[in-house]
């Protein structure tokens, strides 16, 4: 973190919760499901896609937020596809399976892991669009695809000395991409590394690489860019 938070809140005379804590509290108090944006996005969408950094590093995201949203969408009788971005920076470089196994524990007929890929690709912030394109293609187009289960995919990547931050964005068998009428919720609460990937889906005039023109319902845990409508 930085000192800005302290400078902004000194003298406010009350507790000002930061985004991580706010979302944690909403989950604990069972009020996240009542959030207007979350509720509307889920209710008006066919399938729900959750995209987020899958760790408990707490800098950009928290795995518990992804899990909570998946359960909320499932309770609305939605099919939920999880797009898990592996960390390797805010946590150890080779501990993704700890978090993936936590997600596997909630998976069932309605909640499935769709894609996996390292933050090097899905969370770029320096306009390296070739990286972002690989993340987008896995999420939107289910390309490339692996027959391996997700834990074997991670193990095989490790054998090739490709660790969590750099896992190649890949779709899992059974996932066929995002469709018209689906909802996409970006689960990271910190904006700087969520801005690029989310803009690919949100900008009508996106031109950095070829994208599918889809009618999607988009939402994010916080505002990433006031000039991009999510």
Task: Give a label for each model feature.
Residues 1-120, 128-130, 134, 206-230:
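Active-site nucleophile/metal-coordination loop of metallo-enzymes that catalyze phosphate/sulfate
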Residues 10, 186-187:
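Short hydrophobic-aromatic micro-motifs
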Residues 91-179, 194, 202-208, 212:
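Long, well-ordered, tryptophan-enriched scaffold segments
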Residues 182-183:
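Extended acidic, low-complexity intrinsically disordered regions
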Residues 190:
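Conserved phosphate/oxyanion-binding catalytic-loop motifs
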């Amino acid at each position: 973190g930085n000192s800005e938070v302290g400078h902004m809140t000194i003298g406010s005379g009350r507790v000002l919760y930061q985004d991580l804590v706010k979302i944690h509290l909403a989950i604990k108090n069972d009020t996240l499901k009542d959030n207007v944006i979350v509720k509307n996005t889920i209710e008006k969408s066919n399938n729900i896609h959750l995209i987020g950094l899958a760790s408990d590093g707490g800098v950009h995201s928290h795995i518990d937020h992804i899990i909570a949203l998946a359960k909320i969408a499932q309770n609305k009788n939605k099919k939920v596809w999880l797009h898990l971005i592996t960390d390797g920076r805010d946590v150890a470089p080779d501990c993704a399976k700890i978090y993936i196994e936590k997600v596997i524990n909630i998976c069932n007929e309605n909640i499935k892991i769709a894609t996996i890929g390292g933050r090097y690709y899905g969370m770029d912030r320096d306009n390296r669009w070739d990286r972002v394109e690989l993340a987008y293609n896995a999420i939107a187009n289910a390309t490339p695809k692996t027959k391996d289960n997700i834990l074997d995919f991670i193990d095989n990547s490790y054998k090739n000395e490709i660790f969590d931050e750099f896992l190649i964005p890949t779709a899992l068998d059974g996932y066929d991409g995002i469709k018209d009428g689906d909802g996409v919720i970006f689960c990271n609460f910190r904006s700087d590394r969520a801005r690029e990937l989310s803009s690919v889906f949100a900008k009508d005039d996106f031109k950095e690489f070829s994208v599918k023109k889809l009618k999607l319902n988009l939402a994010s845990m916080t505002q990433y860019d006031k000039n991009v409508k999510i």
